[in-house]
Amino acid sequence: MRVTFLEHSGFLVELPSVTLLFDWWKGELPALRPGVPLLVFSSHRHEDHFKPEIFSLDAAAFLLGKDIRLSPRNRARWGLSDETAARCLTLGGSETAAPLSGVTVEPCPPRTRAWRFW
């Protein structure tokens, strides 16, 4: 496993079978490994945790906090295609997601009232 800090709240986590990108909004991404699925997480819509440019990445799935709404207006502003929107999952409450075979994302209860996938 390799973890790269990408400024403020951003991290790139490279596991043998998948790459995870968390809250990237600033700085350059290192070269992504070809052929390895990418999951992109944005915990919430604050500009220091989310930028619409994530949707230009060739990600297997985008896991978004519940305040990142894929309304028709936002989709138009962000240039989001139907194909990309179909790969977006909104996390909130206690739902689990299985964006890839063998990968399960399960929100855990927060320890504070700060922003979260909850």
Language model regions located:
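Core dinuclear metal-dependent hydrolase active-site scaffold
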Residues: 1-35, 86-118
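Active-site metal-binding motif and surrounding structural segment of the metallo-beta-lactamase
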Residues: 26-71
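Short, conserved acidic/polar surface loops in the N-terminal third of protein domains
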Residues: 52-53, 74-75, 116-118
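Short hydrophobic/aromatic-enriched beta-strand-loop microsegments
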Residues: 61-65, 83-92
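Short, aromatic/basic amphipathic alpha-helical patches
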Residues: 71-87
